Amino acid sequence: MTQCDLFPGVSLMYNDFHMESYDSAFRTTEDLLCIDYCRQGRMEYPAGPDAYSYVEAGDLKLDRRLEHQGHFTFPLAHYHGITVGFALPQAAQSLKEWIREFPVDLARLQNKFCSSRHPKVLHGAPSIDHIFQELYAVPEQIK
């Protein structure tokens, strides 16, 4: 995993996992909104007591990371994807200052797609593919 901090409260992560599974103890007290894009592979994990989540190539997941601990499996023994992470409200303030021409209400997005503890997965979102594919074309020296 390679993480780049773009602005205060905004990070970009390139995820490249080559394994069958791992156990996560991740817990946070931060108010987060994470957007995960799966480029290749598949990842599965429990997303609460009565919920299970998976993402595979072309899927987009919006998540608050409230249920991000437990046993993660990679049925294809690999996963490649990108995560854009927002730590609210710091990220909201940074975006207002750094990207004034692109008004986005992160709290509203979080409320729309992540109103519960469970992630929202959009399976097979081809209209989103090109946006995330462009992030793989970023020159190494600025990653």
Predicted regions and their residues:
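N-terminal functional module of multi-domain proteins
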Residues: 1-81
